[in-house]
Design a protein with these regions (language model features):
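N-terminal signal peptide c-region/cleavage motif recognized by signal peptidases
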Residues: 3-5
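Cysteine-centric segments in proteins
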Residues: 9-120
Length: 120
């Protein structure tokens, strides 16, 4: 059976908060970014964290945030991170705190991501 996960060496961890509820999303390096699913956040947003690479080598990271609309998810942010990444063993902040506002009443999605286990 094919698995897109290649290693647990590099770990991307994102804390995503909507309406006072926080979800912790942990992402491992994958070979194929198209196999990574989006995660429903409170029925209002979708969040997708993609880390492409192999083992502790990370080629790139892409983060996507979508507003869930009646017709289809609407992209409200795409963030792209390219090497070099810090190579420390404790988690390193990648994004800082991001606050996104979307929809007719300006709903707020908050997230921050850290990265650990990356090799040069």
């Amino acid at each position: 059976m094919y698995s897109p996960m290649v290693s647990a060496d590099a770990l991307l961890r994102c804390d995503v908060t909507y309406a006072g509820s926080t979800q912790v999303l942990e992402t491992l390096a994958v070979n194929d970014p198209y196999t990574v699913p989006s995660v429903d956040i409170g029925g209002r947003f979708w969040f997708k964290a993609v880390m492409v690479g192999h083992a502790a080598r990370v080629d790139y990271i892409k983060l996507y945030a979508y507003l869930d609309t009646r017709t289809q998810p609407l992209l409200i942010q795409e963030a792209i991170f390219l090497p070099p990444f810090k190579t420390t063993s404790p988690p390193t902040p990648l994004t800082g705190t991001q606050r996104l506002y979307a929809g007719p009443v300006g709903r707020e999605l908050i997230y921050s991501c850290t990265l650990q286990g990356v090799q040069p």
